[in-house]
Curated annotation (Swiss-Prot):
GTP binds at residues 29-36, 56-60, 75-78, 142-145, 170-173. Keywords: Cell cycle, Cell division, GTP-binding, Magnesium, Metal-binding, Nucleotide-binding, Septation. Residues 21-192 form the EngB-type G domain. Belongs to the TRAFAC class TrmE-Era-EngA-EngB-Septin-like GTPase superfamily. EngB GTPase family. Residues 195-216 are annotated as: Disordered. It comes from Nitratidesulfovibrio vulgaris (strain DP4) (Desulfovibrio vulgaris). It comes from the Bacteria. GO terms for biological process: division septum assembly. PANTHER family: ENGB-TYPE G DOMAIN-CONTAINING PROTEIN, MSS1/TRME-RELATED GTP-BINDING PROTEIN. It holds the Pfam family MMR_HSR1. This is Probable GTP-binding protein EngB.
């Protein structure tokens, strides 16, 4: 099945977050992890989501409707961008947490992880938060084309240890690597086909305060 994305609405404040009965999958990741590029790759369009070499550009919650299936991929502000005020980082952290805790139709959290980097603290915090709150988790390595095969495999193994054996998918927006596999996972997640990890002993808390280094 061929799917694409349509930007339906954007929320910049807590009050602008919308209620949708349709299944939603949140897309989260650090600044400059390649979220916008991945959205464009999923949509097979170059400029649906604006991309930039400068981190800190996505400062809103963007609701993309998946056609023809009808579920939503919701692009959250990125985290870990230090070149903005602490007040602004906290604002976007609250926006992310409010979306996650209030979304009754949230089917899962797709966390984007830079294939070039060892597991980062903020990424580990977010995945632990999801597991502690029984949110089905879909880990996705981005920029796989920037890594050699051995490096990709090593990174998958690193994350598998942290995620109870779950290896992340490897993707590359520029080459299309893993995009078809990612679509299959997203459809399954929207249909309730994936389940949260049973073990969450590594989760530090049931709040998302640890990632208040936010904006992407």
């Amino acid at each position: 099945m061929s799917s694409t994305l349509v930007l339906e609405t954007t929320a910049y404040t807590l009050e602008q977050l919308i209620h949708l009965d349709a299944p939603q999958i949140a897309l989260a990741g650090r600044s400059n992890v390649g979220k916008s590029s991945l959205v464009n790759a999923l949509a097979r369009r170059k400029q649906l989501a604006k991309t930039s070499s400068t981190p800190g550009k996505t400062r809103s919650v963007n609701y993309y409707r998946v056609e023809p299936e009808g579920f939503y991929i919701v692009d959250l502000p990125g985290y870990g961008y230090a070149q903005c005020s602490k007040e602004e980082r906290k604002k976007w952290a609250k926006l992310i947490e409010k979306y996650i805790v209030s979304c009754k139709s949230l089917r899962g959290l797709a966390v984007l992880l830079d294939c070039r980097l060892d597991p980062q603290r903020l990424d580990v915090d977010l995945t632990s938060y999801a597991r502690a709150n029984n949110i089905p988790l879909l880990p996705v390595l981005t920029k796989g084309d920037k890594c050699k095969l051995r490096e990709r495999s090593d990174r998958q193994k690193q994350w598998a240890v942290l995620l109870g054996g779950r290896k992340p998918l490897v993707t590359a927006s520029m080459t299309g690597l893993g995009i078809a596999d990612l679509w299959r996972e997203l459809r399954a997640l929207a249909a309730g086909g994936l389940s949260a990890d049973d073990e969450a002993e590594d989760a530090p808390s049931d709040t998302i305060d640890a990632i208040d280094d936010v904006t992407a």
